[in-house]
Amino acid sequence: MDYEFLRDITGVVKVRMSMGHEVVGHWFNEEVKENLALLDEVEDAARTLKGSERSWQRAGHEYTLWMDGEEVMVRANQLEFAGDEMEEGMNYYDEESLSLCGVEDFLQVVAAYRNFVQQK
């Protein structure tokens, strides 16, 4: 899972992720927005879940983060729709709406993001 952190001309941090993990970048850009307290909450949840059968979820405005002791799922909230809403022959492109990754990989991105934000 490759990632890149950038600052736009206003100084706001933007995250770009590799193909297949774009939604993780969108989660940082839309939900975190340099809110380190949210990252604290996610890291605390990961520590609590490690070695357990439980799961944790944080629904945001645009994206929901779900995790258990082994993996993290980020999905767009708009992804919930009935299958019969699609026209016949059409497929829903969800590469940028759903992503799964390991907890350790995700926490590495969280730590790198935190370090980048604090370098102002």
From Swiss-Prot:
Top-level taxon: Bacteria
Pfam families, alphabetized: UPF0231 (PF06062)
InterPro entries xrefs: UPF0231
Stated family: Belongs to the UPF0231 family.
The protein's name in its UniProt record: UPF0231 protein YacL
Record organism: Escherichia coli O6:H1 (strain CFT073 / ATCC 700928 / UPEC)
Encoding gene per record: yacL
